[in-house]
């Protein structure tokens, strides 16, 4: 019985993190993202490789000071 409960809770946790996440314009959900480039620091030189679950800018976009993902020329 406890094994079934564990499997059920594990499946629910996976579904709630991957399907319940809504990202903004030019963003995508990453289950293990890190070191997101920004307008202030477009090139990340040092990265800790720490997994951060959540929305990050799509490839080719940078996060501006307002928290929006924009093309580099819009910074």
From Swiss-Prot:
Which GO terms of the molecular function aspect are on file? Answer: serine-type endopeptidase inhibitor activity
**One Pfam family, short name:** TIL
Locations listed in the record: Secreted; Target cell membrane
Q: How is it modified after translation?
A: May be O-glycosylated.
Q: Which InterPro entries match?
A: Ser_inhib-like_sf, SerProtInhib-TIL_Domain, TIL_dom
User: Where does it primarily localize?
Assistant: secreted
**Key word Acyltransferase present:** no
Gene3D superfamilies reported for this sequence = Laminin
Disulfide bonding pattern of the chain: 23-55, 32-51, 35-47, 39-75, 57-69
Of the GO CC terms on this record, one is: extracellular region
Biological process annotations from GO: defense response to bacterium; defense response to fungus; killing of cells of another organism
Q: Where is the site described as Reactive bond found in this chain?
A: 49-50
Span of the signal peptide: 1-20
PANTHER family, per the entry: ACCESSORY GLAND PROTEIN ACP62F-RELATED (PTHR23259:SF70), RIDDLE (PTHR23259)
Family indicated by similarity: Belongs to the serine protease inhibitor-like (TIL domain-containing) family.
This protein is called Venom serine protease inhibitor BiVSPI
- What species is this protein from? Bombus ignitus (Bumblebee)
């Amino acid at each position: 019985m406890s094994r079934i409960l564990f499997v059920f809770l594990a499946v629910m946790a996976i579904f709630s993190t991957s399907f319940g996440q809504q990202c903004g314009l030019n963003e995508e959900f990453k289950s293990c993202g890190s070191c997101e480039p920004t307008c202030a620091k477009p090139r990340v030189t040092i990265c800790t490789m720490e997994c951060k679950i959540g929305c990050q800018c799509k490839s080719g976009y940078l996060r501006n000071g307002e928290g929006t993902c924009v093309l580099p020329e819009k910074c």
